[in-house]
Regions:
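Conserved phosphate/anionic-ligand binding catalytic regions in large, soluble enzymes, centered on
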Residues: 107, 184-198
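C-terminal accessory segment of soluble enzyme catalytic cores
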Residues: 201-261
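Solvent-exposed residues in well-ordered beta-strands and their adjoining turns
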Residues: 114-116, 182, 195-197, 222
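Glycine/proline-rich loop-helix segments at beta-alpha junctions forming the active-site rim
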Residues: 139, 180-181, 201, 209
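N-terminal lobe of the biotin/lipoate ligase/transferase fold
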Residues: 1-170, 227, 257-261
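Local beta-strand/beta-hairpin segments that build beta-sheet-rich folds
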Residues: 173-179
Length: 261
């Protein structure tokens, strides 16, 4: 391993982008990092190059994705109806977790990181992703947390112990952020999906994350008003930078044809 590390992370805002296109971009950046790591193994120490890191933020048109450990039975409608009636697409992908929904109004984050630049611990990595969302929700006055044995971020997470409940941590357990990652050679891809202004009716057509006895929510649903996605994105990235000791570098991209911005 290269003993020098790179804490810089290039942030890219992709706007509203098709799932396949975003997946291709993840794969391209992932491969770039892995190829550099493999190349470094063949070079003397002084010639080795620092590996890059990326943080992608986007929204997707309506799409359902199924992870490697998921069950297609958790998709409750046939794929023809998905396309023809719901205007959605469906992908089987190589990440952990079961089935989830992505759509407009949801903040999706894809960290493409070389964990050799930070720490080589996948469990810690996932917990820090969750923590960045928990801290972001706290900025809006919401007391979010984790549920033992389940990934993601939840409200009502300790509903069985009302005496421990904090502000707005009331009601049944409901998921506000899904998490699913892949890592190879300590390089990560995929990430998290935070429901901000999401149309939650699209979750009615799946068993979200394969969990039958819990529901989903969004920031807008909890606060009873729409929330600036840009503001949420800025808060998430700052918490990620603090938790991972990152130096964020903004990358200006050409306007995406689906968004014009």
């Amino acid at each position: 391993m290269n003993s020098r590390v790179n804490k810089q992370v290039e942030v890219r805002e992709l706007g509203l982008i098709g799932y396949q296109e975003a997946w291709d971009e993840q794969e391209r950046l992932f491969t770039r990092i892995v190829d550099q790591k493999l190349s470094n193994r063949t070079l003397p120490h002084q010639a080795q190059q620092l590996t890059p890191n990326y943080l992608l933020f986007c929204q997707h048109p309506h799409v359902y994705t199924l992870g490697t450990s998921g069950h297609v039975d958790n998709l409750l409608v046939d794929q023809d109806r998905l396309v023809n009636e719901l205007g959605a697409t469906f992908f089987k992908i190589r990440r952990g977790g079961d089935i989830t929904y992505h759509g407009p109004g949801q903040l999706v984050g894809y960290p493409i990181l070389d964990l050799d630049n930070f720490f080589t611990d996948i469990h810690r990595y996932m917990r820090l992703l969750e923590e960045s969302i928990i801290l972001t929700l706290a900025d809006y006055g919401l007391d979010a947390g984790r549920i033992d044995g389940l990934t993601g971020v939840w409200l009502g997470y300790n509903d069985d112990s009302p005496q421990q409940a904090g502000p707005r941590n009331v009601g049944p357990p409901r998921k506000i952020c899904a998490l699913g990652v892949k890592a190879s050679r300590w390089v990560t891809m995929h990430g998290f999906a935070l429901n901000v202004n999401t149309d939650l009716s699209y979750f009615n057509h799946i068993v979200p994350c394969g969990i039958t006895d819990k529901t989903v929510t969004s920031l807008a649903a909890e606060l009873k008003q729409p929330v600036s996605l840009e503001d949420v994105s800025n808060r998430v990235r700052q918490h990620l930078a603090d938790l991972f000791d990152m130096e964020l570098v903004e990358k200006t991209l050409e306007p995406h044809p689906q968004t014009g911005q």
